């Protein structure tokens, strides 16, 4: 292969190359370009995953992983060719600019009052000169751009309702800032897709910073660009363009400035009032770097506030600065806080932009879209914008012809590449003017050194397996088992006797005493016994997530998962499925490919969620006390294996010819914030408690009633003759081939569809045992309906069959189809039945 035709996939590890062009078409190519891989970009190969694919590359100050097949799309130049190409591009651009109508250039420092105004707002905020009752900014600058008062700030009469949109890249600290500004507690993670729905919260009114405004902050999904290729981008873009918030808060990771400002430039094109929250400035200082915030604000024409969302530093100044943005919008909205496109685009882009603008101006106005935004999106061939503009056929044909002519003659590729390249060139100039690095860009950081170990070719998989084994041992072994035992003793030896005695002394009727003690406390208390294990599991998962290790897991696992029809991106929601299927299913929205998303959702229920832990703990403790941890671990492994094999089956049948691009940013390793970790744990634990206090409580009452009364509503002496017993007896024969063809097991599985924890409370009531009595007593109570062999087969069925109703509802919403949801439920029941039968049969060779 000649040097000119070599691709990024041919580049050896440790070497750099320059991009000639990104081949291909469609969303896959667009995603590669949006991530910063444009003609002339320098890219360095850092390493390959332990199995050789994907690879990690470094460019524009950040790291990205992509598959070798995608790297083969990227043709490279030598350094000399790249320089020559740039010179030709500049010359050609100047020639084209002469043909364009009028001059389209001006400086950010000349004839741009909103640039100077933005910089002035930034300076006032940084120095804290604008405060209620004492605005020295007013006296020094004339009319203060923050409070618009001469002298004392008196605030507004009444509360003006303001809606703010919080927008930023994944891993930029967006959700942490949302929590800091609103006091809301929300899951904070370090992988794409944590915030998958629009969330709202009231900005905290300190009395000093909101100036009479009633501010609502909308936390939009984390996105890398405004291209409509993922559900995240569609939701964020639609909210900004259709619902038009009063102002945008663009959170930018200061440690990854160039990458984050690409989205900033796109947001400026939307012509909405905006302020930049420059996050993680404390980390910038630790690195020895320096960002001139005033210069950055002047270059962009947008107010900039340095903050640290984790510590809360600068957050009040940010809220204060929002007032300036809103007032500026009222005062001079036409100019707004946008940079004119001629500040960013030149040459080819300017000429193309100018011609398209003359054609589509009135249609953009009718559609309620900013003209510059519409022009840029038409140049990119954006399908959503084309639909929104609804151009007449002749106008659309003229636009297509203009774009094609420029694309065919452009030295940097097509119009898509030109637009992305122009944005990144502008961002590079802004960074050069405002960022001073205290160390060489290629110098190894602490994060790089950690990554060399955790993603090492030989150490990555053993370390990952070791971490997971340690988590399981602590959760289900020593610490988790001991804490669960303490809760169990309290429920059965302290609470139940006390309540029973109190009711009897009060002369309560026998049925009421039975309802409270044998129904509610036994049912709800039995589930709460496993609360410590769930808390420990989420504690460790949160640490892995918040530290940045989750993205490395996807990087490591992409190739082995592809062999079974899955993607490395699938691994993240599948791993979160071990916690709860509901947020895991929602997390698939970050997957651009619809088939990948559907297949991942179909496989999620096979990942054993935390709600099944009480069932595992009960049965494993009773029948496999000495090997309890190994039995539970084997169930998790069975779920993983079934998921992998199902994925392979789906890829060969209903999801044929589906191969989405795998591109994921590898964020800097960070020490997990204790507040974030414990907030996450509390949210999951409180959700579990809420479930126990509502669903499990109601189920316990209903089950007690159905167990205690017959069809004539007379109390029964034996649960077998009760309403529930008769229902269970009717369906029990279905489970006879697996060894648990009794009414108690059948009914427990039915209640498990409502909530998996209900299986424990059902068995406890039906079999009449107390969890605090110890494994021997529980085994004695269960031995009438289970043997070790059938108990293990029962656990396999619980592992694989239909998830709880909340999960089914979420799956229905995410799949957007009743047909696919019905298929998922039926497939899971079928697989559970077949696997349970196989396990029961195979175990017959070793146990009774």
Over which residues does each language-model region extend?
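Alpha-helical transmembrane helix bundles of large polytopic membrane transport and channel proteins
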Residues: 275, 285-438
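Short, membrane-interfacial amphipathic segments enriched in basic
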Residues: 432-447, 502-513, 664-679, 716-724
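Conserved C-terminal guanine-recognition region of P-loop GTPase G domains, centered on the G4
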Residues: 204, 208-209, 235-304, 615
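Conserved G1/Walker A P-loop phosphate-binding module
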Residues: 124-225
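Core alpha-helical transmembrane segments of integral membrane proteins
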Residues: 454-555
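Juxtamembrane inter-helical linkers in multi-pass membrane proteins
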Residues: 489-497, 551-581, 656-680, 724-726, ...
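Transmembrane helix-loop junctions at the membrane interface of multipass transporters and ion channels
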Residues: 606, 610-633, 806-817, 838-848
């Amino acid at each position: 292969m000649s040097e000119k035709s070599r691709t990024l996939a041919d580049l050896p590890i440790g070497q750099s190359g320059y991009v000639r062009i990104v081949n291909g078409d469609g969303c896959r190519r667009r995603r590669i370009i949006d991530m910063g891989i444009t003609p002339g970009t320098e890219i360095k190969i850092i390493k390959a995953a332990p199995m050789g694919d994907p690879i990690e590359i470094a460019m524009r100050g950040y790291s990205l992983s992509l598959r070798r097949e995608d790297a083969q799309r990227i043709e490279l130049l030598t350094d000399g060719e790249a320089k020559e190409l740039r010179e030709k591009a500049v010359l050609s651009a100047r020639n084209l600019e002469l043909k364009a109508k009028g001059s389209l250039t001006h400086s950010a420092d000349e004839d741009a009052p909103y640039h100077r105004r933005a910089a002035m707002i930034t300076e006032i905020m940084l120095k804290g000169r604008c405060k209620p009752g004492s605005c020295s900014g007013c006296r020094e600058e004339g009319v203060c751009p923050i409070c618009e008062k001469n002298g004392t700030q008196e605030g507004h009469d009444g509360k003006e309702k303001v809606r703010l949109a919080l927008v930023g890249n994944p891993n930029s600290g967006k959700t942490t800032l949302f929590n800091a500004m609103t006091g809301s507690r929300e899951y904070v993670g370090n992988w794409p897709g944590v915030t998958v729905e629009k969330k709202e919260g009231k900005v905290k009114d300190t009395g000093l910073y909101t100036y009479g405004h009633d501010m609502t902050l909308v936390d939009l999904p984390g996105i890398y660009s405004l291209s409509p290729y993922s559900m995240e981008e569609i939701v964020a873009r639609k909210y900004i363009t259709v619902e038009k918030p009063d102002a945008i808060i663009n959170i930018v990771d200061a440690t990854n400035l160039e990458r984050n400002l690409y989205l900033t430039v796109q947001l400026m094109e939307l012509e909405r009032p905006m302020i930049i929250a420059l996050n993680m400035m404390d980390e910038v200082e630790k690195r020895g770097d320096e960002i001139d915030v005033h210069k950055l604000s002047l270059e962009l024409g947008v107010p900039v506030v340095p903050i640290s969302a984790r510590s809360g530093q600068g957050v009040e100044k940010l809220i204060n600065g929002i007032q300036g943005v809103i007032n500026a919008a009222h005062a001079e909205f036409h100019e707004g806080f946008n940079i004119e496109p001629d500040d960013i685009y030149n040459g080819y882009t300017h000429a193309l932009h100018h011609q398209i603008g003359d054609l589509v101006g009135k249609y953009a106005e009718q559609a309620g879209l900013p003209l510059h935004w519409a022009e840029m999106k038409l140049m990119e061939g954006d399908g959503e914008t084309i639909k929104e503009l609804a151009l007449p056929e002749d106008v659309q044909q003229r636009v297509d012809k203009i774009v094609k002519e420029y694309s065919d003659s452009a030295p940097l590729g097509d119009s898509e590449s030109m637009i992305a390249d122009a944005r990144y060139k502008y961002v590079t100039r802004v960074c050069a003017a405002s960022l001073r690095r205290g160390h060489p860009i290629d110098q190894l950081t602490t994060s790089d050194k950690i990554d060399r170990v955790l993603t090492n070719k030989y150490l990555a998989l053993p370390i990952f397996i070791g971490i997971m084994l340690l988590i399981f041992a602590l959760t289900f072994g020593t610490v988790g088992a001991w804490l669960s035992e303490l809760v169990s003793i309290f429920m059965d030896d302290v609470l139940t006797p006390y309540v029973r005695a109190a009711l009897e002394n009060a002369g309560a009727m026998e049925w009421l005493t039975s309802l409270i003690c044998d129904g509610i406390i036994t049912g709800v208390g039995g589930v709460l016994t496993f609360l410590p294990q769930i808390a420990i599991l989420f504690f460790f998962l949160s640490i892995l997530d918040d530290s940045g290790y989750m993205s490395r897991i996807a990087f490591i696992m992409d190739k082995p998962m592809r062999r079974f029809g899955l993607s490395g991106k699938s691994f993240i929601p599948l791993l979160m499925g071990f916690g709860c299927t509901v947020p895991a299913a929602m997390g698939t929205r970050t997957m651009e490919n619809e088939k990948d998303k559907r297949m991942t959702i179909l496989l999620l229920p096979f990942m054993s969620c935390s709600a099944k832990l009480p069932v595992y703990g009960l049965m494993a403790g009773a029948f496999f006390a000495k090997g309890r941890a190994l039995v539970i671990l084997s169930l998790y492994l069975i779920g993983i294996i079934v998921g992998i094999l199902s994925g392979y089956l789906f890829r060969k049948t209903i999801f044929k010819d589906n191969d989405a691009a795998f591109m994921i940013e590898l964020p800097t390793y960070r020490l997990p914030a204790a507040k974030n970790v414990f907030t996450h744990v509390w949210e999951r634990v409180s959700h579990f408690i809420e479930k126990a206090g509502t669903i499990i409580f109601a189920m316990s009452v209903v089950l007690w009633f159905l167990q205690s009364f017959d069809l004539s509503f007379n109390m029964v002496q034996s649960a077998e003759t009760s309403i529930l017993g008769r229902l269970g007896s009717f369906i029990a024969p279905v489970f006879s081939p697996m060894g648990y063809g009794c009414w108690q097991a059948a009914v427990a599985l039915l209640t498990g569809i409502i909530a998996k924890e209900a299986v424990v409370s059902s068995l406890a009531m039906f079999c009449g045992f107390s969890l605090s009595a110890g494994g021997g007593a529980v085994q004695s109570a269960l031995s009438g309906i289970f043997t070790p062999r059938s108990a293990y087969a029962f656990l396999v069925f619980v592992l694989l069959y239909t998830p709880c109703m909340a999960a089914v509802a979420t799956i229905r919403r995410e799949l957007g189809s009743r047909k696919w949801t019905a298929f998922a439920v039926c497939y899971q029941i079928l697989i559970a039945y077949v696997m349970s039968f196989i396990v029961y049969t195979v175990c017959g060779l070793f146990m009774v």
